[in-house]
A protein has these predicted regions:
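Signature of alpha-helical transmembrane segments and their immediate interfacial
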Residues: 1-34, 427-429, 496-545, 602, ...
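Flexible hinge/switch segments at interdomain interfaces of large molecular machines
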Residues: 35-45, 81-87, 122-146, 174-180, ...
């Protein structure tokens, strides 16, 4: 007995099984975590090292190169990118997709640890980290301000930050605008030398005086007590009274230096609406839950209000949980609207309330089933997985439509009883229903097995589509026949075609008769349309990597010139601030200022509250911002913590750094006049101005000292000495580093630098100018390499012409300069990702088409028939191309997903036609009658399934809600591709069938004739 038969005969059992699955599905749905995008495994590991005060050249040779060379034994490396800059080294290791990144982190840590002793002693230990798509992404930004900033700083550092760091799912808590406290022993070089002290000697005296020592144990009978010498000091006046010398006269620290409680030189300041603020940025871990994390974080902040300094105010400037809830809500809303529209279409065709409700029940049940499957494999509720469900809103009813339509045929044409019709009608089409669903499912199977970003990003969507189609099959061959046997009757099934459909059918039959009579012209027209569309259409379209979304926020980022101090950075920031503040749509803005860059994040309100898009607002701001000098700007439609990413990154590579720099400057100059590019920048920054201290080695040798003594002395005066081994001032709530250095005004005076005293012996000092010369020079700001080859990167944002056009322009300018063979180019950033991902999806599409062919060949037991059916796929591309042109939709990664989806959907109409034609011919009808009758009788179900899919995706294509830009391109692709393909398939496929059938018949006849002639010759010869 078939599954349909069991379901019909045991309705209670079937109902309870369905209810159980629905219950499990609902339970799974409400327990799944919500995220904006899936958890993506990006095989990237970073190695970061800081070396305070070191210039880029020294960082490159003494840190970066040694770390890179240590990785030679690590396997599966795709590329290594390095950046050596003032005071820091960054090594980014990209691995092949599919590797265990955690294992690679362990390997790298092991290899780097082997060369740690070879690194400069004052360089910090390299930090090895795995990069996750989710880790490091900001989930919330909270701005605090208070009149008592010192107390606020202490509260955030000592109380709030530890509480936030203890939350489940937290990745990192970053604080900006709160420079660390320092107890500075501010010295005067001449005064120290007067007391026969060098800064190193003074600091060693201080450190010895405040050190806690373990003394041992004291046993008193039955107890052992640990003895500790407590040298730590916890008051500033205690430091001032530290005894320096008691030879003759008592000398205390306050006699030779000023003890000042201050802060370190600020490197990052925060402002909220122009007011000095402390900014707290939260990011989640790779397995964290944004919604749960933000909720817990905001609850902690609310609970800690009583502990905040008086007058403290705070404002939540970014809450990504709102974006997640809003985006998911809009996708869900689009799905519901699509369901309503699909139901209306069904009713318009069926004209039966019972039948419409019966088919419409299949969709929500199948979707709820799907949640159970997705939950079992750990999928989150995100934009991608929900999109996979939403695009099936119209398609998931197709299986039920086929089943009900065949039950209808058994009741009305074969006069079968309802129970018998439900069972037999379902059994007849079970195989075709499964085959039809499989064509949709198999197109997404390749994505699951092709390593790369495409698999990581679209894995959840693939599973959602596969599982939802699987659930739809189960519902169609169990629940639908069971309900049909109980609720349908002969009266409810008898309907007549409406007047509109009769006109459509009559018009279609005229067209198909003409096409059948003019097969050559019909095929020529279709081929011409295809090639015309392929060659002309793409030239009218723009290319992007990912769809750009209007989330009501944007950021303005400015890269400052090398050597910019914090005060100048603040002045420049105020100019940007005035531009953003005076933009009419600005509701709130947050500003982060450092010596290297400025970031202003602005909130312009929800999409539906304004007429202008966020991109129009950004363009207005960009035009005004061009007038501000001393910085390069870049705008993004997302909040930023100070780092900017561009649409296009053009990498010029070569073994000679000076050569590629000169070449890069020429290309940059040419591109500056191109209107299609905005926010143009490069790594060709002017070098950092250096004061190079050149030691006279003969002189210092004559004094009996070495260069290290001079370097250490200057390091203490300027930087504060050895920060890895500092003394501390311990209070009740914090530990404050104690440093020896010059006062700030003297640290910025070159004359004082030249006159610093260097101790060369007991009571013997010389001026720096006596043993060294100081000269100005321009040092390299950054040294960029990719796989050990010097690289100059030119980056830009799209000014409205599309990424492909910008790429072509960059290549054109590159070639126009006749580059030598030693210089080459490549792509980075989003451009590289776009090329790789598009290539992966194209490869996946090729495999998908082969799988469809294999499936159809198995179904029809023919190698020729699937070729005819697959002919409907190119027809879909005609609709896709002109649909994108009409709607002004760029070609992006979501459009490619729509094309892959189409490959599995559009063939279903051709399958229906060919299958029915074959059925008619097996019943003894001639070819022409079989074709014409099949076209007439299959028109209604083909149009019905097409229109339910098209109207089911219409809300997504309209793109009205938050985040709708993300899936709009895919919906447009499916709607136009399926619509055009259906119209053209109804005409071309019957013609192709006839042409191929005539050809194969003639070929078989010819082979038989040749065979018969051979046999006759053999008989005659015999």
């Amino acid at each position: 007995m078939s599954l349909a038969g069991i379901s019909i005969r045991r309705p209670v059992a079937t109902t309870m099984v369905m209810v159980s699955f629905i219950f499990i599905g609902l339970l799974a749905m409400f327990s799944m975590k919500k995220e904006l995008i899936p958890n993506i495994n990006i095989p990237v590991v970073t190695i970061s090292t800081t070396w305070n005060g070191a210039v880029a050249e020294d960082v490159e040779t003494q840190v970066t190169k040694k770390i890179k060379d240590s990785l030679s034994n690590v396997e599966a490396i795709d590329k290594i990118q390095t950046v050596s800059s003032y005071g820091s080294s960054s090594v980014v290791v990209n691995f092949d997709f599919g590797v265990d990144t955690n294992d690679k982190v362990t390997q790298i840590q092991r290899e780097v640890s082997k060369i740690t002793n070879d690194l400069p002693k004052d360089a910090n230990t390299p930090i090895v980290r795995k990069v996750d798509a989710a880790t490091g992404s900001m989930t919330a930004i909270i701005a605090f301000n208070s009149d008592n900033k010192t107390a606020l700083n202490t509260f955030i550092k000592e109380k709030l930050k530890p509480r936030l760091e203890s939350l489940a799912g937290i990745g990192e808590v970053t604080i900006a605008g709160n420079p660390e406290k320092q107890l500075q022993i501010q010295v005067d070089s001449d005064k120290l030398s007067a007391y026969n002290l060098s800064p190193m000697e003074l600091y060693n005296i201080i450190r010895t005086a405040v050190t806690t020592y373990p003394i041992g144990k004291l046993s008193t009978g039955d107890k052992d007590m640990i003895i500790r010498f407590m040298g730590e000091l916890d008051y500033i006046d205690q430091y001032e009274n530290i005894l320096i010398s008691s030879d003759g006269n008592t000398l205390r620290l306050k006699d030779v230096a000023n003890v000042v409680l201050t802060t370190e030189d600020p490197d990052r300041l925060g402002y909220l609406k122009g007011k000095d603020s402390i900014i707290v940025l939260l990011s989640k871990s790779s397995d964290g839950d944004t919604i749960g994390l933000n909720s817990a974080a905001f609850k902690v902040i609310e609970e800690m209000k009583p502990y905040m300094p008086a007058g403290t105010e705070y404002s939540i400037e970014l809450d990504n949980s709102e974006n997640i809830n809003s985006s998911i809500s809009n996708v869900s809303s689009s799905a519901i609207q699509g369901l309503v529209l699909a139901t209306i279409i069904l009713f318009a065709f069926l004209k039966s309330f019972r039948t419409t409700v019966l088919i419409s029940l299949a969709l929500p049940v199948a979707i709820i089933f799907t949640f159970a499957f997705l939950s079992m494999r750990g999928t989150t509720l995100n934009l991608i997985s929900l999109m996979g469900l939403s695009i099936g809103v119209g398609m998931l009813t197709d299986n039920s439509v086929v089943v009900v339509d065949n039950i209808y045929r058994h009741i009305t044409e074969l006069n079968s009883p309802v129970l018998e019709a439900a069972e037999n009608g379902t059994e007849e089409v079970t195989f075709s229903v499964i085959a039809s669903a499989l064509t949709t499912m198999v197109v997404f199977i390749p994505i699951l097995f092709i390593p790369g970003m495409a698999r990581e990003f679209f894995r959840d969507m693939s599973y959602a589509i596969i599982f939802s189609n699987l659930a739809a099959i189960i519902v169609a061959i169990t629940m639908i026949p069971m309900l049909a046997s109980r609720f349908l009757n002969r009266k409810s099934m008898k309907t007549e075609d409406g007047r509109l459909f009769k006109k459509v059918k009559a018009r279609y039959l005229k067209i198909i008769h003409w096409a059948y009579a003019h097969k050559g012209k019909t095929v020529f027209i279709m081929v011409f349309l295809f090639f015309f569309s392929i060659f002309i259409g793409p030239k009218l379209l723009k290319f992007e990597f990912m769809p750009k979304q209007d989330e009501g926020k944007y950021s303005l980022m400015a890269e400052l010139q090398n050597g910019t101090d914090i005060e100048k950075a603040k002045r420049i920031a105020r100019e940007w601030e005035n531009i953003v503040k005076n933009e009419p749509h600005t509701k709130s803005y947050l500003m982060l200022v450092s010596t290297s860059n400025i970031s202003i994040n602005a909130d312009v309100g929800k999409k539906g509250t304004r007429k202008e898009s966020v991109f129009d607002i950004m363009n207005d701001v960009r035009k005004q911002a061009k007038n501000v000098l001393d910085a390069r700007i870049s705008l993004s439609n997302q909040f930023s913590g100070g780092r900017s990413t561009k649409d296009v990154e053009f990498l010029i590579q070569g073994m000679n750094q000076d050569e590629i720099k000169q070449f890069g400057k020429q290309i940059l100059k040419k591109l500056q006049n191109y209107d299609g590019i905005v926010d143009l920048s490069s790594t060709l920054d002017p070098g950092i101005i250096e004061l190079r201290i050149n030691i006279d080695r003969d002189k210092i040798t004559s004094y009996g000292i070495n260069p290290t003594v001079v370097a250490q002395t200057l390091s203490y005066y300027m930087l504060g000495g050895d920060k890895a081994n500092t003394a501390t001032l311990k209070t009740d709530s914090e530990e404050i580093d104690v440093l020896i250095r010059l006062p700030k005004d003297k640290r910025n005076d070159i004359n004082i630098l030249q006159s610093l005293n260097i101790k060369v012996g007991d009571n013997k000092f010389v001026k720096l100018s006596d043993v060294a010369t100081i000269q100005y020079a321009e040092g390299t700001s950054k040294i960029n390499k990719k796989n050990g080859i010097y690289t100059v990167t030119i980056s830009a944002n799209d000014g409205g012409v599309g990424l492909r056009t910008i790429q072509q322009k960059m290549i054109e300018e590159f070639n126009s300069l006749n580059p030598p063979s030693s210089i080459s180019y490549s792509w980075g950033g989003q451009t590289e990702n776009m090329q790789k991902t598009m290539s992966q999806l194209t490869f996946a599409l090729s495999i998908s088409i082969f799988l469809i062919y294999a499936l159809l060949a198995s179904q029809f037991e023919s190698f020729i028939m699937p070729i005819i059916i697959i002919g409907s796929i190119p027809l879909a591309l005609i609709g896709v191309i002109w649909g994108l042109v009409v709607t002004r939709q760029s070609i992006d990664i979501m459009v490619m997903i729509g094309v892959i989806l189409l490959a599995g959907v559009v063939v279903n109409n051709a399958i229906v036609l060919i299958d029915f034609i074959k059925t008619m011919r097996t019943r003894g009808h001639d070819k022409e009658y079989s074709i014409m009758y099949s076209c007439e009788t299959r028109l209604r179900p083909i149009l019905m399934t097409t229109m339910t899919t098209v109207f089911g995706m219409m809300p997504m294509a309209l793109g009205l809600g938050e985040g709708s830009e993300f899936y709009r391109g895919m919906a447009i692709t499916v709607i136009f591709g399926l619509s055009f393909s259906t119209i053209l398939t109804l005409v071309l496929i019957p013609v192709l069938y006839s042409v191929v059938d005539d050809f194969t018949t003639k070929l078989i006849t010819k082979i038989k004739n040749i065979s018969n002639k051979s046999k006759k010759k053999g008989v005659n010869n015999g």
